[in-house]
Amino acid sequence: MTKPQTLIIATNNANKAREFSAMLAPYDITIKTLADFPNIPEIKENGITFEENATKKATVVVEATGLPAIADDSGLMVKALHGDPGVFSARYAGDHDDAANNAKLLANLGGVPEAERTATFHTTLVALKPSGEKLVVNGELAGRILIAPRGDNGFGYDPLFWSSKFQKSLAELTPAQKNQISHRGAALRQLMTKFDEWWAKA
């Protein structure tokens, strides 16, 4: 069964879209994003789980376009903060502002020693077809939160997230290095192993 020619990544985040495009480059798929469909209504991410938010995004996009879509919801879970910011990661400081989110995270971890600043990045990906056939996969990356930002690459909480594998923050890695270990990369690799079977279903 051939794979679809066009897939919509349900995001307006250009950084996230680039990560998906890089991971999907080996496949013969045309990638589009919400930027290509300005008439799609705003998607409210008000679910209480990553899967609920991702499913909501994918459903809105599929219904509006008639094309298959992949949506993700990702977040940072910090053990010392009882799993926060979690599903609220993108709007932790009140709106979608990386600098403000990072500042709030550092403030809330004030006084917590480095050894106890363990954290996990989580991604849930939902692939949805117009037929309603749904595939859900997850990916995670364990690490810890630094005391101060490091690096100029990446986005979101990347400057604060320490990779033990590379002994660098995610923002100090090249895009290729980040894709090797990232939670989104792990979820996407898992998705692609199941992609053909998912697409072959009615």
Swiss-Prot record:
Domain of life where this protein originates: Bacteria
Catalytic function, reaction form: XTP + H2O = XMP + diphosphate + H(+); dITP + H2O = dIMP + diphosphate + H(+); ITP + H2O = IMP + diphosphate + H(+)
Cofactor annotation: Mg(2+)
EC number: 3.6.1.66
GO-annotated biological processes: nucleotide metabolic process; purine nucleoside triphosphate catabolic process
InterPro entries per record: dITP/XTP_pyrophosphatase (IPR020922), ITPase-like_fam (IPR029001), RdgB/HAM1 (IPR002637)
Residue pairs linked by disulfide bridges in the UniProt entry: none
Residue numbers annotated as active site: D73 (proton acceptor)
Residues binding substrate, per UniProt: T11, N12, N13, A14, N15, K16, S74, F155, G156, Y157, D158, K178, H183, R184
Residues annotated as binding Mg(2+): D73
A cellular component term, taken from the record's GO annotations: cytosol
Cofactor binding comment, as recorded: Binds 1 Mg(2+) ion per subunit.
Molecular function in Gene Ontology: dITP diphosphatase activity; ITP diphosphatase activity; metal ion binding; nucleotide binding; ribonucleoside triphosphate phosphatase activity; XTP diphosphatase activity
Keywords for this protein: Hydrolase, Magnesium, Metal-binding, Nucleotide metabolism, Nucleotide-binding
Function: Pyrophosphatase that catalyzes the hydrolysis of nucleoside triphosphates to their monophosphate derivatives, with a high preference for the non-canonical purine nucleotides XTP (xanthosine triphosphate), dITP (deoxyinosine triphosphate) and ITP. Seems to function as a house-cleaning enzyme that removes non-canonical purine nucleotides from the nucleotide pool, thus preventing their incorporation into DNA/RNA and avoiding chromosomal lesions.
Family: Belongs to the HAM1 NTPase family.
Subunit record text: Homodimer.
Protein name in UniProt: dITP/XTP pyrophosphatase
